[in-house]
Amino acid sequence: MGIKFAHLADVHLGYEQFNRSQRAEEFAKAFEDAIKICVDEKVDFIVIAGDLFNSSRPSPGTIKTAVKILQIPRDNNIPVFAIEGNHDRTQRGPSILHLLEDLGLLYVLGVRDEKVENEYLTSEKTKAGWLVKGMYKDVEIHGMKYMSAAWFEGNIELFKSMFRPEGDAILVLHQGVREITENNYPNYSSELSLSDLPKGYLYYALGHIHKRFELTYDDAPVVYPGSLERWDFGDYSLKLTWNGFQFKEEVGVDKGFYIVEDFKPRFIRINARDFIDVHIKGHSENEIKKAVKLAVPKIPRNSYVRFNIRWKRPVDVDWIKSIVNAEYVRVNPIIIKEERGPDGKDLDVKKFFTELEWKIIELASEKEYEYYLNQIIDLLASEEGKVEAKIDAKREEKKFVRPKNPGDIMAWVKG
């Protein structure tokens, strides 16, 4: 009889997107819907590849929600294996996931100070500490929490030596793979290359990228299921781009997770809030209004919509909001300045900035930029040699130079 499991990631419980509690409820409902499908599908176990929570310090209400939902698989004898992502990990010591483990709701994979042995977990001594691995019949589930690019740069051989499967095994990580992010999602950070992944696994269950993606490495699936709900307007269900005459329509990716049977993934779509991203660059007020009116019939009543209006003058934000019948409407008026160089020709300001810098400038210049702070932080974090990574690297270097004892080496990796 074959193996059947579910692969979820980036649940982000507690995320009050745009400061709206409604969105936190919808993120929770998406998780509950996914878990109930897992039960109906009679999966053997569930893998959560990082960021179950949107914060390492979730509110009591968010913890209560997680407990309620995770009781569903427990009551159906379905073990849940999870790792910490960049949002819900701690620098050192136990995380909120370990509390859920103590409650018998899930099993945390990764490096720890102490050996763990129970029905679904086993431990292996490594140079980093005790590598706690999941077990289900003859299949092992390996994984570790999110680590910075600086950590991988200094410890790639250690990483590969830790993960050497001897039989059927799954590797669970919450990282950006460079070949995937650079070619498909340049706004996401990457910490390692595809070739850095240890070989020999039958399935690579990844998290961190919020749009689903599949490829093959070493004859095995490498899969990002994406987030269960739409994370921002870049993760749109529909993008409308005005070309001066009509809108070009671009359909986004569905949201959901994977059911994996005999290590072959099958995508399961779940209902998610529609996000409509409208881009209009106009040459007159009449053209702007014409484009907005043509966009209105394409916008579902229950959707979240963002209008990006580029024009040389301010636009009537209230007028746009008054004619758009949607659950949530944002208008980002972006004034196009006519910059000219010394020769009198139009000056392309963008050429003085990298793609990443320009993206941050655009986000920070928006009227309601505070809603984009998380995205701006994520973009800044993706910069090579980021401040936090340098601090982490210095900490690691100190630990390797003067460890108090062998068990203290890389102590902050341990959960």
From Swiss-Prot:
<dbReference type="InterPro" id="IPR054741">
    <property type="entry name" value="Mre11_dom"/>
</dbReference>
<dbReference type="Pfam" id="PF00149">
    <property type="entry name" value="Metallophos"/>
</dbReference>
<feature type="binding site">
    <location>
        <position position="208"/>
    </location>
    <ligand>
        <name>Mn(2+) 2</name>
    </ligand>
</feature>
<feature type="binding site">
    <location>
        <position position="51"/>
    </location>
    <ligand>
        <name>Mn(2+) 2</name>
    </ligand>
</feature>
<keyword id="KW-0269">Exonuclease</keyword>
<comment type="similarity">
    <text>Belongs to the MRE11/RAD32 family.</text>
</comment>
<feature type="binding site">
    <location>
        <position position="51"/>
    </location>
    <ligand>
        <name>Mn(2+) 1</name>
    </ligand>
</feature>
<dbReference type="GO" id="GO:0045027">
    <property type="term" value="F:DNA end binding"/>
</dbReference>
<dbReference type="InterPro" id="IPR029052">
    <property type="entry name" value="Metallo-depent_PP-like"/>
</dbReference>
<feature type="binding site">
    <location>
        <position position="210"/>
    </location>
    <ligand>
        <name>Mn(2+) 1</name>
    </ligand>
</feature>
<dbReference type="Pfam" id="PF22411">
    <property type="entry name" value="Mre11_2nd"/>
</dbReference>
<keyword id="KW-0234">DNA repair</keyword>
<keyword id="KW-0479">Metal-binding</keyword>
<feature type="binding site">
    <location>
        <position position="174"/>
    </location>
    <ligand>
        <name>Mn(2+) 2</name>
    </ligand>
</feature>
<dbReference type="GO" id="GO:0030145">
    <property type="term" value="F:manganese ion binding"/>
</dbReference>
<keyword id="KW-0378">Hydrolase</keyword>
<dbReference type="InterPro" id="IPR041796">
    <property type="entry name" value="Mre11_N"/>
</dbReference>
<keyword id="KW-0227">DNA damage</keyword>
<dbReference type="GO" id="GO:0004519">
    <property type="term" value="F:endonuclease activity"/>
</dbReference>
<dbReference type="GO" id="GO:0000729">
    <property type="term" value="P:DNA double-strand break processing"/>
</dbReference>
<protein>
    <recommendedName>
        <fullName>DNA double-strand break repair protein Mre11</fullName>
        <ecNumber>3.1.-.-</ecNumber>
    </recommendedName>
</protein>
<keyword id="KW-0255">Endonuclease</keyword>
<dbReference type="InterPro" id="IPR050535">
    <property type="entry name" value="DNA_Repair-Maintenance_Comp"/>
</dbReference>
<feature type="binding site">
    <location>
        <position position="10"/>
    </location>
    <ligand>
        <name>Mn(2+) 1</name>
    </ligand>
</feature>
<dbReference type="InterPro" id="IPR032885">
    <property type="entry name" value="Mre11_archaea-type"/>
</dbReference>
<comment type="function">
    <text>Part of the Rad50/Mre11 complex, which is involved in the early steps of DNA double-strand break (DSB) repair. The complex may facilitate opening of the processed DNA ends to aid in the recruitment of HerA and NurA. Mre11 binds to DSB ends and has both double-stranded 3'-5' exonuclease activity and single-stranded endonuclease activity.</text>
</comment>
<keyword id="KW-0540">Nuclease</keyword>
<comment type="subunit">
    <text>Homodimer. Forms a heterotetramer composed of two Mre11 subunits and two Rad50 subunits.</text>
</comment>
<dbReference type="InterPro" id="IPR004843">
    <property type="entry name" value="Calcineurin-like_PHP_ApaH"/>
</dbReference>
<dbReference type="GO" id="GO:0008408">
    <property type="term" value="F:3'-5' exonuclease activity"/>
</dbReference>
<dbReference type="GO" id="GO:0000403">
    <property type="term" value="F:Y-form DNA binding"/>
</dbReference>
<feature type="binding site">
    <location>
        <position position="86"/>
    </location>
    <ligand>
        <name>Mn(2+) 2</name>
    </ligand>
</feature>
<dbReference type="InterPro" id="IPR054745">
    <property type="entry name" value="Mre11_thermococcales"/>
</dbReference>
<feature type="binding site">
    <location>
        <position position="12"/>
    </location>
    <ligand>
        <name>Mn(2+) 1</name>
    </ligand>
</feature>
<feature type="active site" description="Proton donor">
    <location>
        <position position="87"/>
    </location>
</feature>
<keyword id="KW-0464">Manganese</keyword>
